[in-house]
């Protein structure tokens, strides 16, 4: 029993010293926000119009100069959303300049889509984000027009980040 007690004492002493770890896990890094992923200069890949009443779609990319569409989503020095500008000669479905922000800066736990909010000082335009840049530098959002609360037409913009 004396040997068993000595082994137990040795084992518990060894565990006490090895239980304290001095491994440095690094410093805290803030999570990547949707604003960080979405900010930048985006050029159009395609624009689709959807008739919400009967789900018919039409490609508008090569019509009405949509292929000239560019949106710049700028950040301030702290990395927060700041201003935006829209360039090109496509029809003005969006405001041409103002401020932007996300309705929620992270992926939502209830799987509802995030909204990109454009404010030109007069009104706020909400764009439903349908694809977020990741491995591919593709951003997609949908602008939905409504009358009496009912959607009647939507425009889906598929964009690629411009080369700097």
Model-identified regions with their sequence ranges:
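Lipid interaction determinants
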Residues: 21-95, 103-164
């Amino acid at each position: 029993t004396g040997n068993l007690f000595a082994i137990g004492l040795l084992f518990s002493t060894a565990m006490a010293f090895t239980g304290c770890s001095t491994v440095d896990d690094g410093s805290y890094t803030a999570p990547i926000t949707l604003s960080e992923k979405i900010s930048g200069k985006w050029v159009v890949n395609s624009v689709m119009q959807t008739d919400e009443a009967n789900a018919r779609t039409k490609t508008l990319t090569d019509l009405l100069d949509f292929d000239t569409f560019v949106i710049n989503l700028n950040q301030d020095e702290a990395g927060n959303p700041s201003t935006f500008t829209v360039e090109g000669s496509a029809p003005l479905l969006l405001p041409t300049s103002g401020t932007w922000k996300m309705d929620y800066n992270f992926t939502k736990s209830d799987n509802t889509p995030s909204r990109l909010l454009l404010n030109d000082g007069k009104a706020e335009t909400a764009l439903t984000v349908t694809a977020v840049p990741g491995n591919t530098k593709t951003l997609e959002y949908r602008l939905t027009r409504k009358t009496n609360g009912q959607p009647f037409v939507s425009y889906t913009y598929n964009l690629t980040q411009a080369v700097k």
